[in-house]
Amino acid sequence: MNILLTPARIGSLEIPNRIVMPPMTTRTADEEGYVTDDTVAYYLARAQGGVGLITVEMASPEKAGRHRRREIGIYDDRFLPGLTRLVDEIHRAGAKASIQLGHGGGHTRRHICGETPIAPSAIPHPVYETTLETIVPEEMTKARIEAVIAAHAAAAARA
């Protein structure tokens, strides 16, 4: 028997096999971060193909943390209908779902996140999206760090 195809447990979660898909950027969300039909089709194809656990690509816990165009949003309840539809389709195909929560920090760009990028320190660094640019993020205050932590907690609750 091939152990790869046998069920496994992660805590109380039972997955149908040990094939796990890691998060990979697809840029299939719309410009605001809503799940689209293309997003659902992409993940559904992997679930139908036999993946036991799919980790959906990085979703930003706050708008200021979006670091790519067409990145999934999870920073507001308005994203829940699309995310719920995505998870329901993955489950219907027999797979389990998780999601990667991530804040772009100093790798965000004002034209994507809507404000000056933030990071633990204001150290310039190169970022490549469609062109190479140097980003100098705003140094986070203790209050801003606490706000990002709270945003992650709220996003985890939505997930």
What does each of the following model-derived ranges do?
Residues 1-158:
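Flavin-dependent oxidoreductase catalytic cores
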